[in-house]
Amino acid sequence: MIGARVFCITTTALRRSPIFFFPKIPTRPVFRLSPATRPIVAMSTTSKNQEELDSIFKQKRVVRSTVRKSLKAMDPSLRTQQDEAIQKTVLEAPWFKSCKGLCAYISCKSLNEVDTSKILSEILQHPDSNTQKKLYVPWVEDKNSNMRMLHISHMEDLVANSMNILEPAPVDAQGNDREDVLQADEPIDLFILPGLAFDRCGRRLGRGGGYYDTFLKRYQDRAKEKGWRYPLMVALSYSPQILEDGSIPVTPNDVLIDALVTPSGVVPITPRATESM
């Protein structure tokens, strides 16, 4: 199912421009923040000082707090319905079926993330099939925003870490290092991303650790070095996580997404996503 295609003043331009701004788009948002949480209208990377950056980080904290409360208040039955709808959309999508390699997050219930268990199970269900996809999942390396994406073949490859979040052991059952996607010889086609809040201009707000933005930048550098096409960046989102366009503050370190998968379907954001979806 394809959702409404809403375009902001070119997302490509946003990726390249040194000016970070928050346009007012005449579209009805799924969720509106109060005026007090809306970000500063314009920021230039050439004139930002620490005070301005601190202001953006403060705005991010306010948005995170608002969205966390909304997620916590979600009815469990509604959450289950949205989990099923989102995963069904992904599993039936041509861009998912055709991908040969991908990075995907392992959902954590305590973080109120969109469930990915059916997606992962489908990928790992037929390891010897011709349609098998090569799957890489997150392994947090340290507390300094360093994360790796390691290859797994079975759900049994996952163990709970100190925060009770499933992740791959860095070595397999035979004692061999797991393949790191940043050292792989072949590119991946797709990232399935988590997040705390999103808008239809491609802005993504994480949980504040910087792990995904740091990793995505590294993979983009790797792809550029190898001459590979960038993978499609697709985020999964419950309804309360989709904010009014321009409500999410951004910095030069924030990586934009290509598309959203919502309970209502797919929302392509970039021209590439429109072509693929």
Swiss-Prot record:
Optimum pH is 8.5. The keyword Nucleotide-binding applies. Substrate binds at residues 113, 207-211. ATP binds at residues 60-64, 206-213, 254. Disruption phenotype: Reduced growth rate and delayed flowering. NCBIfam families: MTHFS_bact. This is 5-formyltetrahydrofolate cyclo-ligase, mitochondrial. It comes from Arabidopsis thaliana. The lineage of its organism: Eukaryota, Viridiplantae, Streptophyta, Embryophyta, Tracheophyta. The gene is 5FCL.
